[in-house]
């Protein structure tokens, strides 16, 4: 990150990230990609609660150290990914996941903002209690309603990544416009609902960025002055 910041010379911010303790635990319990073994992983968590708790506590300590190292190395912000939030039952989320979020965000350096991403954001009320500076939300969350619920919170999202992958440029423009309208252009970071899909055309990503820059300009402030500097 230090080398990247030197190369960028303050022109762009650098975002650090880490998988959440539960996301890492899913991979460790499955022994490989857990997507085909979700039921088995969830059954293990419930049946082996003490082992799961011990594993999550160890991973939480490691995650805090890892993210703080990234901040010390020059990350302007860090994001924690809860990649399987959409399949985790509420009781498991409350018992095992939420405590890791609260411990991590309370232990991070305050010199950089922190972002919490939970896939499709099924538990917004709990996300708001995590201690993160920013919440990255999925398609199931209406930005307008989220901001009414928590007017001081900064939300990130939530253009559908499928539109970028398979949509026309006109559809991408419309999606960005809708996202800005829902957010009211206040306390909002434009982004996707999730990562880029593998088959997303570069031209569509470029168009998304160009439209975001054009529609997201702050009145009276040149776009190049909006980025944080070192």
Question: Model-predicted segments: where are they?
Answer:
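Active-site loop segments of alpha/beta catalytic cores
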Residues: 2-230
């Amino acid at each position: 990150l230090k080398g990247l910041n030197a190369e960028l010379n303050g022109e762009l911010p650098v975002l650090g990230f880490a998988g959440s303790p539960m996301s890492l635990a899913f991979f460790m319990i499955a022994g490989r990609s857990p997507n085909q073994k979700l039921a088995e992983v969830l059954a293990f968590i419930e049946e082996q609660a003490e082992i799961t708790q011990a594993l999550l506590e160890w991973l939480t300590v490691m995650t805090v150290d890892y993210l703080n190292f990234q901040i010390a190395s020059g990350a302007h912000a860090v994001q924690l990914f809860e990649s399987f939030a959409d399949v985790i039952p509420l009781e498991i989320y409350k018992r095992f996941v939420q405590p890791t979020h609260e411990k991590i965000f309370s232990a991070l350096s305050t010199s950089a903002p922190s972002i919490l991403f939970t896939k499709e954001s099924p538990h917004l009320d709990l996300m708001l209690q995590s201690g993160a500076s920013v919440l990255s939300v999925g398609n199931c969350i209406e930005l307008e309603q989220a901001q009414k619920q928590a007017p001081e919170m900064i939300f990130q999202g939530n253009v559908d990544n499928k539109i970028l992958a398979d949509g026309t440029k006109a559809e991408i423009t419309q999606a960005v416009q809708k996202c800005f309208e829902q957010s009211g252009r206040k306390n909002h970071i434009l982004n996707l609902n999730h990562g880029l899909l593998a088959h997303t055309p570069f031209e569509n990503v470029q168009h998304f960025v160009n439209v975001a820059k054009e529609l997201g300009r702050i009145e009276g402030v040149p776009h190049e002055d909006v980025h944080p500097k070192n």
